[in-house]
Amino acid sequence: MVKDEFFLDHPGRKHRSRNTEKKKKPRRRERRMKQLVCIKSPWNRFKGIMLQLRLLLEVTINPNDNKLKPDSQGEKSRDGDSISKKGSRYVPSFLPPPLASKGKGPENKRDEERSKEMEKGKTRNIDHFVEELKREQEIRERRNQDRENSRDHNSDNTSSSRFDELPDYFDPSGRLGSLDDGDPQTTNLYVVNLSSKVDENFLLRTFGRFGPIASVKIMWPRTEEEKRRERHCGFVAFMNRADGEAAKEKMQGIIVYEYELKIGWGKVVFLPSQALPAPPPGHMAIRSKEGCNLIFSVTSGPPMNSVPNQNSELVLTPNVPDITVISPEDEHLKQIIDTMALNVLDGGCAFEQAIMERGRGNPLFNFLFELGSKEHTYYVWRLYSFAQGDTLQRWRTEPYIMIAGSGRWIPPPLPATRSPEHGKESRGTYAAGKSRCTEAEQTLTDSQRDEFEDMLRALTLERSQIREAMGFALDNAEAAGEVVEVLTESLTLKETSIPTKVARLMLVSDIIHNSSARVKNASAYRTKFEATLPDIMESFNDLYHSVHGRITAEALRERVLKVLQVWADWFLFSDAYINGLRATFLRSRNFGVTSFHSICGDAPDIEKKGLIGNMNDADKINQDAALAMGEGAARQELMNRPISELERRCRHNGLSLLGGREMMVARLVCLKDAEKQRGYEVVDENAKYRQGHSTWEEVNIEPKRMKTSYDKVETEEPVDLASTIPIPQPELKAFVKKEKIDLILPTSRWAREDDETDDEQKKSYSSGSDNAGGITFKTDEEDLKADPSVRVQPENEIDVEQRQKLRHIEIALIEYRESLEEQGMKNSEEIERKVAIHRKRLEADGLSGNQRVLPEKREKREDSRDSSRKRNRSESQNRSQSPPQKSLTRERVRDHDLDKDRHRDRDRQQHDLDKDRKRRAKSSSRERDDHDRSRERDRDWRRRGMR
């Protein structure tokens, strides 16, 4: 025990332990300083984060406030030691133990003081940071209070709208906080002043119409103060810059839910590989800044009755003007908009976006991009109308509210029952497949008009000159109205020579033919010329009748009719329109139509008087003829028609409207008369080879003496001529018979056989009535036969002869066709051509045979007339003579004639068959000869080759 106590109390051991403690003190100090550095570094990091938040929250610090200046210069301790600067690396000062212990107090006391100083420095930095945060909060509250005071002051002074307020997202300096105009390649749009009703889908639908969108973001409010503002901002990033520029240009200043949009460029954002998909359909309320047009970006939304209850009550907003929907004047553009609306309702927003991407730059789809145009308003109304179940022809016409808070929508009126011509005029505004919208039609400049007039003055029938003038017209198709006006004026001048007029007509034909070219507004030429061609033909009619030379008149007639036929072949106009132009050109002067130049005031006074006098005389003659045959009734019926219907008929039939009601009625009567006359000419050409005993002079009836009806335009009830006009019934019956004879058309042989049986029944019935009907009908028929002015042939005899001839011709043609097919001919066109030639030959043979038999028939008719006269005298003396003898003699004569015709037809048929056999034999012999020659030629070649 004593030894141990000595060991513990040994002075050397105490000295060693003291030295050890001195060595441990610097180590302990270093460890404490490292702990202090570890404590300070998180606070420095946290302070940097708060400074960044201060920048984001737009906190401004007064640079003159030195009290808040942090201790960044470093502090010196009482003993002169310096503390390193904030944020710099700490390097502790190390002094050896002997130097550190020199001239100083007790070591334990100094260590405690240093530790206290370090603890005081640590708490001081934290306190400074907390105080700095408190001061920043006070500054923020003071700024918000000043802003509220300024708002109250402005509201007291002037009643400014919410659009005059500066958004909270602007700095006090006036610069948008998130705008970045430095990068010209950014596609990110910064949208300010959005309503609280707007969400991401709304922005995607609204801005998606301009192009594919990469991302949409709305900065939703977080604090109660931000929520009280009821508006916020957002970002819309497009996939390309061009779409963003278009959206910025079109949507700038647009009012959305009563908030005016302010759009600028934002910072560049990352673009994904694929754009956002199309959103589901919804509803929007957008209108332009003026408040006159409401704009829908969503096109396939459900009906308005599907809107939630909070928006179901549509209340009219005061001081908001009504929105009037105007239907586009261009029928083609209207049709495109209607079709687009129907397809968008089926395909949704994706279909509309696809059309907008492909149709960008196409004038036909400008209504999708011009949100303030009346075409876009019509498009939006069409979408809503179709969604409500309306159709293209019927819709709601009373005003209604489509969106809560907007004005009333006034739909366009329902289309009236308009004539097709009115539709043509409205469709005439369409030009070359492109919409002209509502811009006014262009006109030629003075130099262009003078150039075109010089071309027309020097125009001849040379192709180069006509081609040059036609090229000028197409190059200036935008001024089609003035070009047509100049051409029409030049074609209706009375002083123009015939070759020049014909050349100008050829120019009109070339322009109309090229109106389908892919030139803007070129198609307007056809529509505008359609309105002026009737007047041009009226002028050509005056020119045609004023020509004295027969050859010149015939050449003019041939040229004009060729042009009209070419138009008919090109299907440029309807057949009725072409027929009207042709009838106008060929109309004679005795139809009561005043000449074109007399109506326009171009004719001299003497000529006018002469024309008026001739017209009055012709009117008297035509009135007498009309009273005789019922034309006056038709004319009177037309005179009672309204003027609008007469104009419609004239436009449809290519007739001029000049001269008023009387002239239009006269032109319509002349047109119908010309159509009937053309029908007679066609029938005469078909029947002149079949009726050898009848010529045009025998069966011709004056066209002006026939009843006129307008069955082509409107079916009218027939006029009973016998009840209205005292005409003897036998003459009327004879006229009807002759008309029947004249209107025989070639039909099928099966129909002819049916007709034959019917006619035989009628014949037996008529013979029975003759036998039992009394004397009055017989004497009337005999009087008709005795009258040389009315040449009537027995109807049954003519019908039987005609049917027999046609039957034999058909049989011969069938046999001839079979013979051609047996010969190996397979070309159907060649067979038809030969059959047609053979038909003409057979008809010509029948005509010559009929002409040979004609004198015999005339002698028989004269004998029958003499016998009828003798029979009449004998009947006056002796009434007891029986009528069956007359019928028997008629039947005998008819049977004799039928036998003759039968034998003659049989002989002719046999003769034709012999001819065909001979021709066949000749052709076969020729073929054999050709074959023999070819074989001999081959043999010769072989022999030469062998040699």
Curated annotation (Swiss-Prot):
Keywords: mRNA processing, mRNA splicing, RNA-binding. Residues 1-35, 63-167, 412-434, 752-797, 846-947 are annotated as: Disordered. The keyword Transport does not apply. SURP motif repeats lie at residues 336-379. One of its GO terms (cellular component) is nucleus. Gene3D superfamilies: 1.25.40.90, 3.30.70.330, 6.10.140.420, Surp module. Residues 12-34 have a biased composition (Basic residues). GO terms for biological process: mRNA processing; RNA splicing. GO terms for molecular function: RNA binding. Residues 1-11, 66-84, 104-155, 854-876, 888-916, 924-947 have a biased composition (Basic and acidic residues). Expressed in leaves, inflorescence stems, roots, flower buds, open flowers and siliques. Residues 638-672 form the SAP domain. Pfam families: CID, cwf21, RRM_1, Surp. It comes from the Eukaryota. Residues 187-268 form the RRM domain. InterPro entries: CID_dom, ENTH_VHS, mRNA_splic_Cwf21_dom, Nucleotide-bd_a/b_plait_sf, RBD_domain_sf, RRC1-like_cwf21, RRM_dom, SR-CTD_assoc_factor. Probable SR-like splicing factor. This is Protein RRC1-like. It comes from Arabidopsis thaliana (Mouse-ear cress).
